[in-house]
Amino acid sequence: MQLNSTEISDLIKQRIESFNVVSEARNEGTIVSVSDGIIRIHGLADVMQGEMIELPGNRYALALNLERDSVGAVVMGPYADLREGMKVTGTGRILEVPVGPELLGRVVNTLGEPIDGKGPIGAKQTSPVEVIAPGVIDRKSVDQPVQTGYKSVDSMIPIGRGQRELIIGDRQTGKTALAIDAIINQKNSGIYSIYVAIGQKASTIANVVRKLEEHGALKNTIVVVASASESAALQYLAPYSGCAMGEYFRDRGEDALIVYDDLSKQAVAYRQISLLLRRPPGREAFPGDVFYLHSRLLERAARVNEEYVERFTKGEVKGKTGSLTALPIIETQAGDVSAFVPTNVISITDGQIFLQTELFNAGVRPAVDPGISVSRVGGAAQTKIVKKLSGGIRTALAAYRELAAFAQFSSDLDEATKRQLTHGQKVTELMKQKQYAPMSVFDQALVIFAAERGYLTDVELNKVLDFEAALLSYARAHYAELAAQIDKTGAYNDEIEAQLKKLVDDFKATQTW
């Protein structure tokens, strides 16, 4: 076989063209100190803020302090075997976590790795944990409800899709219980839920996961865990990871609800990291940017308009708005809402549900204080029937609290005051609700209708809850069609009012409570 020079030169050219060599220039640095999970690195001149730094042993650190001649980074994972002189490399990318419907029903850590023993997740997409929140033009006003299933919340402090509603109170006042019930109530509402547990005991988290599974809500929920035994870095990053998972649904025209339980522990973890990085401490030893820590997280909870969703999905989803509703939880010390972190989060959110120890200990559960709890934007999203009927509930409770304090000093009260006190006591009793027993729109509307139209006047105080239970079971047995109609539409008109009146009159005639 003879080859001429042209063929040889063509063959060589072909080989050269198909030869593929990839050269990758990566920044390299050297560890100069390791202490308390913080490493100082010499070199890495063009590292970014928040960049992932690759360490020996398939671990990563997060660059947080960019100084003149060194980089301060926090290690995500064990650091006992890291030594001075070890080589590290910059990755050129910031932290990303897996996102998508594959995560529903799973328990993951801050990095999106499964920790529930159910095998790999197989998510098809990842998303950066730090994303800039949608701008003003991309947002739409809140006008659709998120039903928590609690009478006291849905009637007096309504929450809308895309709202940020703070749940605040001392330890052991039922904050987590309220949030978990809100998640359970979404199992058939089409709203996906994300529960982020920060700095909690592993046994507490396991109990929450079991309850969600028992009530059939885990299949629509992602649980993100940074337990008390995890490093401060993972506790600090967990809310951002959960938020990225929630934004996946928001940006595709779906609705999601995220619970941060709780942001006080995240702030403490961030304080720990900041002090170890030698950042100057401020009030309560928190760093100066602790407000920004929470504001950039909570601003990502929003309702986005149709144009935003269409642009994001490149025209795949048309005519749908998306929302991410946030329920951040803050733990106060002895009811002190004027501390640094509580005041910050109150000023960022669109309202707060304040839970009081005194009410909780008095058996009023959920222990919502209607006097200082407020929803700034939820009124527009409230179900029409509940909005129409519940106007007098807050007023009755506020007047009752005022009169109850006044009545302690006076024995001879006039009839009108006595009536108001009795009505207030009965409404307070009626607002009580058991855990894991969320109520439908119809159930809430019926109970509030009975209270507002004076049907409780001849019911003894200790029989109010029995009256409620009997009324609801009677309604379900005899007025199932009306119940289905109200649950579906939430509408209220003269015809529905007449039917509700007939229902309660018929029930009272039976005297079966």
UniProtKB/Swiss-Prot annotation:
The keyword Cell inner membrane applies. One of its GO terms (biological process) is proton motive force-driven ATP synthesis. The keyword Cell division does not apply. PROSITE patterns: ATPASE_ALPHA_BETA (PS00152). It is a peripheral membrane protein. PANTHER family: ATP SYNTHASE SUBUNIT ALPHA, MITOCHONDRIAL. This is ATP synthase subunit alpha. It comes from Vibrio cholerae serotype O1 (strain ATCC 39315 / El Tor Inaba N16961).
